[in-house]
A protein has these predicted regions:
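Hydrophobic, lipid-facing positions within transmembrane beta-strands of outer-membrane proteins
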Residues: 49-56, 104-110, 123, 131, ...
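Transmembrane beta-strands of outer-membrane beta-barrel pores
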Residues: 27-33, 59, 75-81, 114, ...
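Short glycine/proline- and aromatic-enriched beta-strand/turn motifs that initiate or cap beta-hairpins
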Residues: 19-62, 199-201, 205-208
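Structural signature of outer-membrane beta-barrel channels/translocons
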Residues: 56-63, 113-117, 166-170, 205-207
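Repeated loop/turn-to-beta-strand initiation elements of outer-membrane beta-barrel proteins
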Residues: 21, 63-69, 118-123, 171-175
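Predominantly the C-terminal beta-signal and adjacent terminal strand-loop region
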Residues: 32-36, 78, 150-208
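Outer-membrane beta-barrel translocator domains and adjoining extracellular loop/strand segments
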Residues: 33-41, 81-92, 135-145, 187-193
Length: 208
């Protein structure tokens, strides 16, 4: 069974047993750490924005006052831009050297939340793991567009590790900030020579 079919099966099973659930929307700002096939790092890459959507359930398997557990499904956009823009070479011709990545990943997540303050509002430390695959992606180099599904850097399962803080202002509304690191499972342990992503995320969670 492919991971995309597994996610669909997970969602159907998830809502069959769900009694309380949440919807989380967020904004991502992602930086790529990218080395091309010639082992040259692209120093001109810049962070770019994207969106995040999650649906999940808390405390499905266990519930304590000291820790909260959440599982669910996610859709994430990890994007980047770069290049030196437009200029003139020695022949007087205009040279365009620009890059743009637009991606959509779909996956499942597993998170823990540990409260550190609970006086009127609740503040918690959050950590978690997201396993995802590229659903759709395009790379634009100057005026040429390439399908990232054909790129070895984006094939396979990606692992995203997360750590952050959240503020729950009432039983239904929670705001969060997280730092996330994403890498293909095949690249874990290879250091800076492998393609990876760092993302800053702000989010709003609506709890049912």
């Amino acid at each position: 069974m492919s991971i995309k079919k597994s996610i669909l099966f997970f969602l159907v099973s998830f809502f069959s047993f769900s009694q309380s659930y949440f919807l989380e929307v967020g904004a991502n700002e992602t930086e790529y750490n990218y080395t091309n096939e010639n082992n040259v790092s692209l120093e001109t890459l810049e962070a770019s924005s994207g969106l995040s959507f999650k649906v999940g359930m808390s405390d499905l398997f266990f519930e304590t006052d000291e820790i909260s557990h959440s599982i669910g499904a996610s859709i994430q956009s990890f994007n980047a831009t770069g290049g030196r823009g437009t200029g003139m070479d020695g022949t007087g011709l205009t040279q365009v050297d620009s890059y743009e990545w637009n991606t959509t990943f779909v996956g499942i997540f597993n998170e823990l939340s540990i409260p550190i303050l609970n006086k009127g509002i609740s503040v918690a430390i959050n950590s978690g793991i997201d396993l995802s695959v590229l659903l759709d992606g395009k790379q634009k180099i100057s005026n040429a567009i390439f399908d990232l599904n054909d790129s070895d850097d984006f094939k396979g399962v990606f692992q995203t590790s997360k750590v952050g803080l959240s503020i729950k202002i009432n039983e239904s509304i929670e705001f969060g900030y997280s730092i996330m690191y994403s890498s293909g499972l095949k690249n874990i342990g290879k250091g800076d020579d492998a393609f990876n992503m760092k993302t800053n995320q702000v989010s709003l969670k609506i709890i049912k």
